[in-house]
UniProtKB/Swiss-Prot annotation:
Bridged cysteine pairs (disulfide): none
Subunit structure: Part of the 50S ribosomal subunit. Contacts protein L20.
Superkingdom as given in the UniProt entry: Bacteria
GO molecular function: rRNA binding; structural constituent of ribosome
Annotated HAMAP family: Ribosomal_bL21 (MF_01363)
Native source species: Borreliella afzelii (strain PKo)
GO cellular component: cytoplasm; ribonucleoprotein complex; ribosome
Gene, per the UniProt record: rplU
Full protein name: Large ribosomal subunit protein bL21
Classification via NCBIfam families: L21
Reported function: This protein binds to 23S rRNA in the presence of protein L20.
């Protein structure tokens, strides 16, 4: 059983008992989480599609931790100008455990 859920404007596939890697959430929202914007639910081949969301459905999750992803390096070099720029970025993600899909 899985569901497609919209969290902070992005869509994720949520499976019961598995972790979701989402963009960092604010400290106020941590602890027990519940997301009501479920787009699709698939249970044993029976598919429910929302218009745009499935009515009376939600996903209950538990916050686990924040982690940083691998560093992404952006490098720009201008030939014959003696100019170059190197910038690194590490995105922070929150890991949440999907406890239950309710519908």
């Amino acid at each position: 059983m899985y569901a497609l859920v919209e969290i902070n404007g992005k869509q994720y596939k949520a499976v019961e008992g598995e972790f979701l890697k989402i963009d960092k959430i604010s400290p106020i929202e941590k602890e027990k989480l519940e997301f009501n914007s479920v787009l699709l639910i698939n249970k044993d081949g029976e598919i429910k599609i929302g218009k745009p969301y499935v009515i009376n459905s939600s996903i209950k999750c538990t916050y686990k931790e924040d982690k940083k992803d691998k560093k992404v390096v952006s490098y720009r070099y201008r030939r014959r100008k003696s100019s170059e720029r190197k910038v690194g970025h590490r995105q922070t993600y929150s890991y949440i455990l999907v406890d239950e899909i309710v519908f």
